[in-house]
Structure formats: structure tokens, C-alpha cells
Regions:
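Glycine-rich flexible loops
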Residues: 1-222
């Protein structure tokens, strides 16, 4: 639980009231349960009592507990992708500037600098806007499955149009690094656009970074 709380506290700056949610697999019952932020709680003040234990069907162990309304997509990801141990969903300001614009497809499919490739992958999965709750879970499922079929890997960064981002990882530090790198990339994207035409990495340059054994080692260390 401590890692989930640390994840929440690190990603809390800029959040208002109950914005965002975080979760992590239960280390004692890894195969069939996870802990998630309770509805109405805040990332910056999140404590152990604010976490709700849920089955992989999104039903809480204690029916009196009320998990985040986004529990459905957390449950679906854990149930279908064993490599994911932590999930963070936030609404970062610079990234949402892009996700609320026609530039969102460009931001998802192009890359600006090597560390963006390392932390956020060659491409990101872009999810069209859907109402939070079951409609959003269904759209996330549809787009992730399509992305995995097309790209051959699970997305490190999931972008939600007019909403926010989802990052996943084997450790909470993966989620932190991916979330912070996304926001840094968004700030650079907006700044570069203001200065003129953006100069992106080429596909060859992106693949060279992605396949570099030194970068693979850095990923493992981080």
C-alpha cells in the first residue's frame, strides 16, 4: 500500500479536490485483487484508509466501500495484462491542452526527443472521448486491443481525448516516470509549436533509440 500512496502523493501537484486516481495490485493476492483510491478522496492527502480493495471484476471486497468511479478500466487492465502492477490516471495541464485540441493525434503518434521514446514508447494509445465510467472502460478496451494488434506492444502511455492520461507499470516508479515525461513532452510540444514547425524524430531515429541495449538497461534500472 505504501507504494500506492507514494504514487498518489508524487502525482498530486496541480490536482483539484478528487481529481485523478491510482491503484496497485495486492501483493498478497496478486492474481485476483487490487487496491484503488476511494471515491471522493484526494491524491495529495491519500492515506491507507482511503484505499479500497477490489476483485478483478471491479467489485469491492467490502460492499460498503465506494471505489473510484474509474475502477472499471483499472480492473480490466489488471485482469488482462499480468505485467501491469500499478496504474495512475491524472489530468496534467499541459497534456490536456493538447488533448483538448486537434493536435492530439500528432502528439500520440510522433516523438520529439529520445527520453520520450524511452519512457512513453514509440507511440501512445489515443482514446476518443467517452463518458467516465463504463463507456470509458469500453472505449479504452477497444483502443488498447487495437493498439496491441497494430503495434505489437502494450502502450506505456494512454491518452484520453478531452480528459487526461493513464500510465501503467510493473512498479509505481514506472507510472511516475511515464506521467512526468508525458507532461514534460507536452510542454515542449506546445513550446515548439509556438516557435514554428515542430522538428520530430524520424522513424529511423525512434527505432534506434527503442532498440538500443543501453536504453533497455536504463529502463530496467529506472
Amino acid at each position: 500500500m505504501d507504494d500506492i500512496l507514494e504514487l498518489a502523493h508524487i502525482l498530486s501537484p496541480g490536482t483539484i479536490c478528487g481529481e485523478g486516481n491510482v491503484s496497485g495490485r495486492d501483493v498478497n493476492f496478486k492474481s485476483n485483487s487490487f487496491w484503488i483510491k476511494a471515491s471522493g478522496t484526494s491524491l495529495d492527502t491519500l492515506k491507507q484508509d482511503d484505499l479500497v480493495a477490489c476483485h478483478l471484476n471491479a467489485v469491492p471486497f467490502n460492499v460498503k466501500d465506494k471505489p473510484s468511479m474509474e475502477v472499471l478500466f483499472h480492473a480490466w487492465i489488471y485482469d488482462n495484462y499480468d505485467e501491469v502492477n500499478f496504474i495512475a490516471h491524472t489530468h496534467p495541464t499541459n497534456t490536456n491542452k493538447i488533448l483538448c485540441s486537434e493536435s492530439c493525434h500528432e502528439f500520440a503518434n510522433r516523438r520529439l526527443f529520445p527520453d520520450q521514446v524511452v519512457r512513453n514508447g514509440r507511440k501512445s494509445c489515443l482514446v476518443p472521448y467517452a463518458t467516465p465510467g463504463r463507456p470509458l472502460r469500453d472505449e479504452i478496451k477497444k483502443q488498447i486491443e487495437y493498439f496491441v494488434d497494430e503495434e505489437g506492444f502494450f502502450p506505456k502511455l494512454i491518452l484520453l481525448e478531452n480528459h487526461g492520461i493513464i500510465t501503467t507499470g510493473s512498479s509505481y516508479k514506472d507510472c511516475v516516470a511515464s506521467s512526468l515525461m508525458c507532461e514534460k513532452s507536452a510542454e515542449i510540444f506546445v513550446g515548439a509549436r509556438l516557435l514554428g514547425q515542430i522538428q520530430y524524430l524520424t522513424e529511423h531515429q525512434i527505432m534506434a533509440v527503442d532498440k538500443d541495449p543501453n536504453e533497455a538497461y536504463r529502463r530496467k534500472i529506472f
